[in-house]
Amino acid sequence: MGAVRIAPGLALLLCCPVLSSAYALVDADDVMTKEEQIFLLHRAQAQCQKRLKEVLQRPADIMESDKGWASASTSGKPKKEKASGKLYPESEEDKEVPTGSRHRGRPCLPEWDHILCWPLGAPGEVVAVPCPDYIYDFNHKGHAYRRCDRNGSWELVPGHNRTWANYSECVKFLTNETREREVFDRLGMIYTVGYSVSLASLTVAVLILAYFRRLHCTRNYIHMHLFLSFMLRAVSIFVKDAVLYSGATLDEAERLTEEELRAIAQAPPPPTAAAGYAGCRVAVTFFLYFLATNYYWILVEGLYLHSLIFMAFFSEKKYLWGFTVFGWGLPAVFVAVWVSVRATLANTGCWDLSSGNKKWIIQVPILASIVLNFILFINIVRVLATKLRETNAGRCDTRQQYRKLLKSTLVLMPLFGVHYIVFMATPYTEVSGTLWQVQMHYEMLFNSFQGFFVAIIYCFCNGEVQAEIKKSWSRWTLALDFKRKARSGSSSYSYGPMVSHTSVTNVGPRAGLGLPLSPRLLPAAAATTTATTNGHPPIPGHTKPGAPTLPATPPATAAPKDDGFLNGSCSGLDEEASAPERPPALLQEEWETVM
């Protein structure tokens, strides 16, 4: 009878086509969902069954051999390793068979066991097949093992009517994941708290900038658009998580045991109708859109500041419309292109799996915005350092200049999203171990809390915002004081000075600051004239001719002409932006507001 020698690579003969085709669909830097895993399993099963028909149609491949199967082992393992007895101990039946005749007989037929394709097995040998790449959570460096007995049948589990197989190397990530689960739980808590805090703080910041009319200017309008993009990004993340993982925990959605994989493979294929995935696809689409708009409004902030510094003729109101279209419209274009391509060429699952190179339709524009914004940041810091050296020459030491430069740079970093550049060239799937944990904690922390940092620096710590809040608070407390004293009837009021038993409060330019003027704090002549007139209290609303009056704002404490871009002053900024040239002194004032 003819003999057929199994080539060393025959163990992968049936599986390689399945692995290569499935690998084209599974993207290495995405998270596998349960629906996508089911799809890949059914696809692998169909391709395996096709290969089985081709192999079984060649009877010469499965004929009995008179010369034996001495070199037919497909395990790829040395015999001394198989004799260890840890993974695949020899049966008593095999021990009784002489070594020279162990491989004589009919081989075990190839088959699909609902997880992977098993090739022809040499009788009396253990067959090892690499763990399939199309099962996302498997250890792809391990092997699965089966034993082919001398009768040409796959060995059964004692006491059970099922084939024995050892998947322990493949599922080691599934059986020992306590520490990994702790890491993922901690990362989930970080980004949940971070986006929640950012959403709350940004909501307050937008309400403040929208409420006070004195804060309405081009720069603050751009800030409000940026704040809104951060808010929508946080909301879209929460909605996406709720939709994708509704009805199942993260464990159930992404972690499948060996028995669950078998049950899934035996079930009918998942429905391919788009209506079944409409909700999650809409959630994923809006998440990608708001993610892209957030990156592009960060770029708009950089372009605006760069234009103020380097463009002599810059109409802020005119460019605001262009910035608005750029920030909200351009991301809509490439996200719409991605949706069209995905719906046409890879309309599977919830679209949260990128399906190969189609992800670059969205990722390339986002990466381009990050790189461009980083270039703008470097150029602006260079100009800032030059102005600091020119302005402070001879007035402060070098260490003080460096401290000012460092402070200004740190203030600009959240606005420009500089932290994105750190791990931009290192996808998280290309690293492992401690470096992977460092990268993930870094990105989750800064990405989720970036909105909070931006709201703190550019709204809550803004000098003009604080002044407007103080004025509003003073007016509110003053109105309450009016009502309280009016009900008590202890004083009379008019549009002149307010007269009380202890002080005189001028309802004038300084009233907005809520500063009561005590006679003890006034000059002697002013205190005498203001407090009494010929020993009598002054008449409300009456001012004696020639009486000395306090200036509205002391010259020594006069506010600077322009509080600057970074400090948030809107006064005079729009008018001065259209000037032919921006004076160097004014530019320096804009930068020194952060020092």
Swiss-Prot record:
State if Iron is listed as a keyword.
no
Q: Write down the membrane topology.
A: Multi-pass membrane protein
Q: Name one GO cellular component term.
A: plasma membrane
Cite the ranges annotated as topological domain Cytoplasmic: 210-223, 316-318, 382-404, 461-595
Q: Which residues lie on this side of the membrane: Extracellular?
A: 29-188, 245-294, 340-360, 426-439
**What processes in GO biological process is this protein linked to?**
adenylate cyclase-activating G protein-coupled receptor signaling pathway; adenylate cyclase-modulating G protein-coupled receptor signaling pathway; cell surface receptor signaling pathway; intracellular calcium ion homeostasis
Tissue-level expression = High levels in the kidney, with much lower levels in aorta, heart, lung, prostate, testis, and skeletal muscle.
Superkingdom of origin:
Eukaryota
Kindly indicate where the leader peptide sits in this chain. 1-28
Question: Which residues carry attached sugars according to the database record?
Answer: 151, 161, 166, 176
Transmembrane domains' residue ranges: 189-209, 224-244, 295-315, 319-339, 361-381, 405-425, 440-460
Gene3D superfamilies, alphabetized: GPCR, family 2, extracellular hormone receptor domain, Rhodopsin 7-helix transmembrane proteins
Compartment(s): Cell membrane
Q: What are the start and end residues of every segment in region (Disordered)?
A: 66-103, 528-595
Motif: Important for interaction with G proteins; annotated at 473-476
Q: Tell me the keywords, alphabetical order.
A: Cell membrane, Disulfide bond, G-protein coupled receptor, Glycoprotein, Membrane, Phosphoprotein, Receptor, Signal, Transducer, Transmembrane, Transmembrane helix
Q: Where is the composition biased (Low complexity)?
A: 547-559
Which post-translational modifications are recorded for this protein? N-glycosylated.
InterPro entries documented for this protein:
GPCR_2, GPCR_2-like_7TM, GPCR_2_extracell_dom_sf, GPCR_2_extracellular_dom, GPCR_2_parathyroid_rcpt, GPCR_2_secretin-like, GPCR_2_secretin-like_CS
Disulfide bonds listed in the record: 48-117, 108-148, 131-170
Q: Which family does it belong to?
A: Belongs to the G-protein coupled receptor 2 family.
Function of the molecule? G-protein-coupled receptor for parathyroid hormone (PTH) and for parathyroid hormone-related peptide (PTHLH). Ligand binding causes a conformation change that triggers signaling via guanine nucleotide-binding proteins (G proteins) and modulates the activity of downstream effectors, such as adenylate cyclase (cAMP). PTH1R is coupled to G(s) G alpha proteins and mediates activation of adenylate cyclase activity. PTHLH dissociates from PTH1R more rapidly than PTH; as consequence, the cAMP response induced by PTHLH decays faster than the response induced by PTH.
State the protein's name: Parathyroid hormone/parathyroid hormone-related peptide receptor
